[in-house]
Every structure is written in C-alpha cells, then in structure tokens.
Swiss-Prot record:
Organism: Marinobacter nauticus (strain ATCC 700491 / DSM 11845 / VT8)
Annotated family: Belongs to the heat shock protein 70 family.
A Pfam family reported for this protein in Swiss-Prot or TrEMBL: HSP70
Induction comment from the UniProt entry of this chain: By stress conditions e.g. heat shock.
Function: Acts as a chaperone.
The protein, known as: Chaperone protein DnaK
InterPro entries: ATPase_NBD, Chaperone_DnaK, Heat_shock_70_CS, HSP70_C_sf, HSP70_peptide-bd_sf, Hsp_70_fam
Keywords attached to this entry: ATP-binding, Chaperone, Nucleotide-binding, Phosphoprotein, Stress response
Biased composition (Low complexity): 604-615
Compositional bias per record (Acidic residues), positions renumbered to this chain: 626-641
Location of the region described as Disordered in the Swiss-Prot/TrEMBL record: 602-641
Keyword ATP-binding: yes
Length: 641
C-alpha cells in the first residue's frame, strides 16, 4: 500500500513529509530545498513554473506570476479582504460566474483551487521521486480558522492535483503532533502560536498519555485569516515606496515591475533584520524619468522595521486572549509555547509572545517544517502505521439555525470536538403550515442577521396541523475535516431534506474574527434584542391563544366583551410591528386582563365537560412540549421548481 503523504499547503511556502519507519522525514524538492515557494508562473511559451523557478522570473513577469493564492481560496469576489487583495497584487483577480474570487492569466479565468493544485502536484512529485512509487493519498493542512468553504476548496485542489485527500487537519494541531510525539513524559498543555505567510492561528492543546496512547485534544482555537508575513512585507514595501517618493518625487506604485522588485527586496530585508540590526536596500535602475535612470538606496534598521509592524504583532495577541478565555485558562497555566510559521523568527514576535505567556517559547521546533511533519504523522495514523495517537480537534465557530423572531439558535457551539452530530426538535410558527425553510447560520451573535448565512433549504409536504404540533428534527453533522452537513426531517411522515454547505457560500476572514469581537462588544445589544424577541413571542402567543378561545366561545361571549378583546388584540398587533419592548409588554398585559374573564368562563365549561367525560382525555395534552418555537418561512407551491 502506498504511503499517505503530509502536505503543508502554505500561503508563502509549502512542504511535504512522510513517515519513514518511526521517524518523520521532510522531503527535499528537485532543487534540493526542504520548502517550496507557493508561487506559480505562466510563461509566454505556455510553460507552467512552480516554486523557486517561478519566483526567480517574477520581476520580469509580474502579471502572470501568482503568489499568496491561499488568501483567495474559498472566497467570494465581493469579500472585503479580496477587494483589499486586488490593490496589493500585480496579477488580476476576477469575478467568476458564481461570484467566487478567481484569477485571470493571459485572458483566461482560473479558480484558486486550480492554481493551488499546481503546488500540490509539485509536492506529490517530490514525494514520488523520493519513494520511487506512485502517491495517491494525502493529508493536507489548513489554518484552524478556515471556514467550511475554504476547507472544501482545499479538498478540491487536492482532487485536481490527483490526490485523494484522506483528511484536512488544522495547522496548529499538526504542529503539536510533530512536537508531542517524541516527548514521552507526562501530561501538558501547549499553546501553538502559528504566524505564517498569510494567516494566524492560536490553538490551546492538551497532550496526555491515556492508557499508553498519545492523546492530543484541542481545548480552544482562535485566529485571523488575513494576518501573516505578506502583511509584514507590505508594510516594508509601503515604507520603501514612500521613502523613494520623498527622495525622487516619483511614485513607484503604478509600476508593477518596480513593485515586484520592491516586494522581493522587502522580504529579503525583513529576513536579514531577524539576525542583524541594519540592512541596505539597494535597487539600481528601479525606474527612470526625463533626467535619466533612478536608483533606490535606503537604510533600514531593525528598530524601524519593528515600529512599522508593531500593530500587526499586537493584532495577533487578541486571538490569544480569546482562546485562553474559551479554554478557561490563564496564560500562566500553559506549560509550553510552540512557535510555528516563518514569521515567528522575527525577534519582536518572539519577545511579545514571551511577554504575553510569561515564558520563553520553545526553539526545538522547526517553524517551517513542523506542520508538514504533523500532517505526515496523521497520515500514518490513518493508514494504521502509527497506532498510539488520538487526535481530537474542534470547530472554530458556533453553528445554528434561525428561529422565531430572527434569533440564531445554536446547535453546535464553537470549540466543540469534531467529528460531532447534534439534533434538536423544532416546530411550525403558523397553523396548517405545510413547509418550512431551514436557514443555517455561523457565528457568535444572538441575532441571525448579524451572523453569516451558510445556506437555506426547504422541507415541504408537512401535514397541516396547529402550530407547535409538527415535530421537525434538524440535525447538524460535522465530519473530521470540519465540513458541515445539515438535514431536516418531519418526524410524522419521515420526509427528509439535507444540504452540504457548498464552497460558494463561505465566510470571509474579516467576518469570522469580527463575529467573535462583535459578540463581546455587542453583548448588551444582544441582550436587549433577546428580551425584545421574548416579548414579541409572548405577545404573539397571547394573540394566537385569545383568537382561538374567541372562535371556540362563539355566541357564549357578549358583543361588548368581544369588542374590547378585538380592540386589545389590534393594539397589541400594532405594538408587535414596532421595537418598543415596554409597549409590547404593556399591550400583552392589557390583552391578558380583558380576556381573563373569557378564559375563566371557557375553563369552567371545559371542567364540566371533562367531569362528564370521566377524565378520559387525561394525558393526551402531552404533545410537543419539548419543541422549540421556530419561525420558518412558508414555501408557496408556485415558488417551487
């Protein structure tokens, strides 16, 4: 049986590893390097270059050289971060027919998974050359904070590259696997700080020995899918362009060739300043004007670089706080801090992490290779070559459905261990409702509209019944890759509908981190909204109950009584249209008072009838007491296709 390889598909660099006996081996590519730049170029003679060869010709071919494609994977063209990316890169980002963000090269549109597949193909070939046999299966890593669409798109890239993706695993978890496998002693809690080329993750992971088995349990994860080395480079590029404009009066930002040279120089300067205090950026013939050629010569000190990127490093500490809070831990309770991702080589990053956790981060983990090594270990676990490892990962955001009054009712809370399956019974909002729309949302806000809509589907042909009677079982099922399936079943008829959340409806990165931040900042607003919805639901239920009692009472109620009840109903219905909680509560109370006499009369009549019937109906009232009222849109037959 061929080996399952482990691939770290990175924003800036990628890496491939395998389990060789009981040791993990990172495989060198054809150029002799252990990592490969995630850069793809399309040349004039229709050749596709991947890795170092693509990087070398980027300066002369900026429009057809694609890098940081991982930032576009599984995203919509209209996403804020994609719009931000358009201004940052020399290649063209185009809108696909389905609204996704694609790239355009030589007049041809290409999907990000298609481009990423070229990098995966090179990783596959690297492994095949080393093993001397065909490779068809892989474990591929993704940032822990990747959403459903991004995970799906990564799987698609693997498929395009001719790989069966056996598992998608989170990068920090993979790094913890690589770190923890050869450390035999005792239980410990580690924080994996993963600052890569394009994304940032922080995971808190408990490593324990359970009956001779290494158990890796993720307690909490948080992150920012648009924060990484590319952003650090951009700060340096901006600074160099500003300095040049100040010195020569020429703005290089419109010159893609010059900007590509600046990008290369900025990355090189940033790397040099991790080991030296000062570097020179020398770029002869960067541009020219009427007076002749212009050269760039800028001195850049480590202190200057640190002042340029300090806000980015600071931004990475926010998810650290949230993850600790979610895990119910203090920074001092973390036993080890592991740094992953090339950007963690920067002294300022190491210093801030040390300051935050109060301990020196470990230096015995290779930040560029640990993730691929962890993926290879997971591959060996799946193929049965490694038997004493159990990996328990989590879903990063709360998943639920929209219920009555626009509330997001959670089914699976964030940081729930996956795979997981959860069901809950919901019901109809109106009498004789024959169809419901299940609206799936993802995020931390109480109001469904404030969260991200992942998809909708209809469950039709529900037998007509009073509201609250039908029992609709909604089931959320997250697989080990973190990919979601949702189904709804009418328990009376057994009729079922389901949906796999498709890549075209994913979240964008800003929204994800914003959701968690907003949830904290808007806790008060959410509380008021919940109270308003509660008042509305009580008012609604009161109107429904009184109307029903009125129609059952028939001529037992006098005209004057009927008039005052109808007037109170009208007042309450008007109040329900607005957003004044106090007014709704007052009108509900008024309706309760004017209808109480009628209710007592009806109750007395029923008591008499019940006595005569000998109480035979006892116990039949237990219908769907456990059902949660849910406001589903009724699906009209003529809307159906």
């Amino acid at each position: 049986m061929s080996k399952i390889i482990g691939i770290d598909l990175g924003t800036t660099n990628s890496c491939v590893a395998i389990m060789d006996g009981d040791k993990v081996k990172v495989i060198e590519n054809a150029e002799g390097d252990r990592t490969t730049p995630s850069i793809i170029a399309y040349t004039d003679d229709n050749e596709t270059l991947v890795g170092q060869s693509a990087k070398r010709q980027a300066v002369t071919n900026p429009h057809n050289t694609l890098y940081a494609i991982k930032r576009l994977i599984g995203r919509r063209f209209e996403d804020d971060v994609v719009q931000k990316d358009i201004k940052m890169v020399p290649y063209k980002i185009a809108k696909a027919d389905n609204g996704d963000a694609w790239v355009e090269v030589k007049g041809q549109k290409m999907a990000p998974p298609q481009v990423s597949a070229e990098v995966l193909k090179k990783m596959k070939k690297t492994a095949e050359d080393y093993l001397g046999e065909k490779v068809t299966e892989a474990v591929i890593t993704v940032p822990a904070y990747f959403n459903d669409s991004q995970r799906q798109a990564t799987k698609d890239a693997g498929k395009i590259a001719g790989l069966e993706v056996k598992r998608i695993i989170n990068e920090p978890t993979a790094a913890a696997l690589a770190y923890g496998l050869d450390k035999k002693s005792g239980d410990r809690t580690v924080a994996v700080y993963d600052l890569g080329g394009g994304t940032f993750d922080l995971s808190i992971i408990e490593i324990a020995d359970v009956d001779g088995e290494h158990q890796f349990e993720v307690l909490a994860t948080n992150g920012d899918t648009f924060l990484g080395g590319e952003d650090f480079d951009l700060k340096v590029i901006e600074y160099l362009a500003d300095q040049f404009k100040k010195d020569s009066g020429i703005d290089l930002r419109g010159d893609s060739l010059a900007m590509q040279r600046l990008k290369e120089a900025a990355e090189k300067a940033k790397i040099e300043l991790s080991s030296s205090q000062q570097t020179d950026v020398n770029l002869p013939y960067i541009t020219a004007d009427a007076s002749g050629p212009k050269h760039m010569n800028v001195k850049l000190t480590r202190a200057k670089l640190e002042s340029l990127v300090e806000d980015l490093v600071q931004r990475s500490l926010e998810p650290c706080k949230v993850a600790l809070q979610d895990a119910g831990m203090k920074a001092g309770e973390i036993d080890e801090v592991i740094l992953v991702g090339g950007q963690t080589r920067m002294p300022l990053v190491q210093e801030k992490v040390k300051e935050f956790f109060g301990k020196e981060p470990r230096k015995d983990v290779n930040p560029d290779e640990a993730v691929a090594m962890g993926a290879a270990i997971q591959g060996a676990v799946l193929s049965g070559d490694v038997k004493d490892v159990l990996l328990l990962d989590v879903t990063p955001l709360t998943l639920g459905i929209e219920t009555m009054g626009g509330v997001a009712t959670p089914l699976i809370e964030k940081n729930t261990t996956i795979p997981t399956k959860k069901s809950q019974i919901f019901s109809t909002a109106d009498d004789n409702q024959t169809a419901v729309t299940i609206h799936v949302v993802q995020g931390e806000r109480k109001q469904a509209a404030q969260n991200k809509s992942l998809g909708r589907f209809d469950l039709a042909d529900i037998p007509p019944a009073p509201r609250g009677v039908p029992q609709i079982e909604v089931t959320f099922d997250i697989d080990a890759n973190g990919i979601l399936n949702v189904s709804a079943k009418d328990k009376a008829t057994g009729k079922e509908q389901s949906i796999v959340i498709k890549a075209s409806s994913g979240l964008n990165d800003d929204e994800i981190e914003k959701m968690v931040r907003d949830a904290e900042a808007n806790a008060e607003e959410d509380r008021k909204f919940e109270e308003l919805v509660q008042a509305r639901n009580q008012g609604d239920a009161m109107v429904h109950a009184v109307r029903k009692t009125l129609s059952e009472a028939g001529d037992k109620v006098s005209d004057s009584e009927k008039e005052s009840i109808e007037a109170a109903i009208k007042d309450l219905e008007e109040a329900l249209e607005g957003s004044d909680k106090e007014a709704i509560e007052a009108k509900t109370q008024k309706l309760t008072e004017v209808s109480s006499e009628l209710a007592q009369k009806m109750y007395a009549d029923q008591a008499d009838q019940a006595q005569q019937a000998g109480g035979q109906e006892e116990g039949q009232a237990k219908s769907a007491d456990d059902a949660v009222d849910a406001e589903f849109e009724e699906v009209k037959d003529d809307d159906k296709k």
